[in-house]
Amino acid sequence: YGVSLSADNDSKSKAPGGVADFIFNVANTGNGEDTFAITVDGNSAWIPTASQSNITISAVSGSQFTVSVTVPEDRSAGAESGDITVTVSSSDGESTANHNVSVSTSQVYDIAIDHMSGFDGTATVTQETQLQLKLNVTNNGNGADTITFAMKNQPPWAALGSDSLLIGPGQTLPLTINLDPDTAALSGRDYIFQVVATSSDGSETTSPDLTAQIDVKETEGEEIVTEELDEDDEGGLPGFSMFVSLLALTIVVLSRRKD
């Protein structure tokens, strides 16, 4: 009687909910057919399971079976199963072989960007004044993620408050966008732009639209004085009554000279 055991890998990595399959090679090194019992010991939360409970192999021959390990849904990135021990035992009750494998949790990258509560994405800003918009950035993954940001279709007077954020799993942080339109920003036009977030694995998420509407800045000018005419001014012209009086006086003088 004799037996040997090996696996295709000693360790594998899967995302939460994923299943890691290990292929085991078992060899009968004895000189007769033998049936080997298969047992698996390990962290029960990871559900280590063999594809079969025993295997029959001819003399000096080999065969395979599979051990599957399921990563629990609630595991954070980097969490490990610990050793999972697989043992095959000969029918003689004495010849055995074992091999340890393990599984680690890979990181899931999942970013969401949304308008903050009570903000529909549209804001009005006056020329040569500053205004801040904010977006909520949420890490729905299972590990900390350094997220970088870039703007898309933005006007020249819009800028990010931060180029990157480190966000923990399940955490939400605000991202600020600064608006500082000059007098060249056109009133009556909607400036529509977005923010693109890139996770550490290179995956991208685009924010909903942000819209900036421009108000023209009011400027101080000279006070305009309006002169109101009296109702008895003929033709509505200032000084017209005086002109008529002078004309009448001239006619009278000329008449007297003729006399």
Regions found by a protein language model. Give the residues of each.
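Long beta-sheet-rich domains in secretory-pathway and surface-associated proteins
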Residues: Y1-D259
